Amino acid sequence: PQVALTIVLVMGAGYLGSSIVLVEGAQTLESLKDAMVFVCILLFGYPALIGAVVAYILSDMIEGVSPDVVWRWIECFPMTEAYCWIGYQFIGKDPDFRKLRTWGWYALFVTIFMAFVPPLWGFACGPLSGVFSAQDSYYKITPALFLTLVFTWILVPPLMLGALPLARRLGLY
């Protein structure tokens, strides 16, 4: 059930986030989808890794990314989840953001994630796949992704403060 629940939650968060416009014509609350991926991985562990990859692929296609582009990025989809797995190793056993210890490990995880994931997707979008030029990929996409991910990591703690007690009550954590 955790794989299916992850797919539903991530796709639902993607749909909701893409309908909330932060900057007209430029920025939606796409961060909500990424935050939900991390929340699901923290709550469900390994099954969420599988569900999140499927959810990202389906969500991108529903949002209008062509199957050709999705195929060119296919080996990159598990990358974000792999880095989230590092965060799971740090705080997955006790992801309670009411505890100071959780915040310390979370800060370390976010630092590692932000140092590597935006440039890796810059590479994936440009030189690896050829979808965008290297210039656009590194000087436009990478900084935009960095900014989007800042919102992601701001959203995770309040989401976890609500999701963890609910998951415990439902027997999912």
Give the positions of each predicted feature:
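Single-residue recognition of alpha-helix boundary sites
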Residues: 44-45, 56, 159
